[in-house]
Design a protein with these regions (language model features):
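Helix-rich terminal scaffold detector
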Residues: 1-20, 115-162
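A short, compositionally biased
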Residues: 32-36, 58-59, 101-102
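Short, flexible, solvent-exposed loop/turn segments with mixed acidic/basic and small polar residues
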Residues: 37-40, 70-76, 102-107
Length: 162
């Protein structure tokens, strides 16, 4: 980085890719994507001040800043997750109920796999109740995968814009 200028972001750009731009990333943990204000350095050392618009959803790869020299994207770090793999909807429903009582967000990884961030007190209880159907694995918990009782908020925001 050539200067100590703070990059202040209060709206997200319309991406117009250029050929010779440097790629940079603002690294976030899964639980930071809903924060309204984020101040930290990017991987390349740029000081970023993100004042997130309330309607914006910070998902993996989202461009949050672009100029003629660089593009800054969101990078959500993978984390240790408790994963239930089951095609039995009753088991999936019970698991979601057990996890929902802890107010942890649930993520749909694929058709038969759901994940939540690791919780050291909850994992043994889930393993005891669901056996080998529950395991630990590393996943990127992206807001586009979150399950809500009224549908996926990310997908609803996309439909409203179209």
């Amino acid at each position: 980085m050539q200067n100590n200028e703070v990059i202040r972001i209060d709206s997200l750009p319309v991406v117009q890719p250029l050929n010779n731009q440097e790629e940079d990333s603002l690294v976030l943990e899964w639980y930071e994507v809903n924060r309204t204000i984020i101040k930290r350095k990017s991987l390349a050392g740029r000081m970023i001040h993100l004042d997130k618009p309330s309607s914006a959803v910070l998902k993996q790869g989202l461009v949050i800043y672009q100029d003629t020299k660089c593009v800054v994207r969101i990078f959500i770090k993978p984390c240790t997750c408790m994963v239930l793999q089951s095609s039995n909807m009753e088991v999936v429903g019970l698991f979601c109920f057990d996890v929902g009582n802890r107010h942890l967000p649930i993520y749909m990884i694929d058709d038969h796999k759901i994940a939540i961030a690791y919780d050291g007190r909850l994992f043994p209880a889930l393993q005891q109740k669901y056996g080998n159907a529950v395991s630990l694995a590393n996943y990127r918990l992206d807001p586009s995968q979150i399950i809500n009782c009224y549908g996926n908020i990310y997908e609803q925001n996309i439909k409203k814009k179209n």
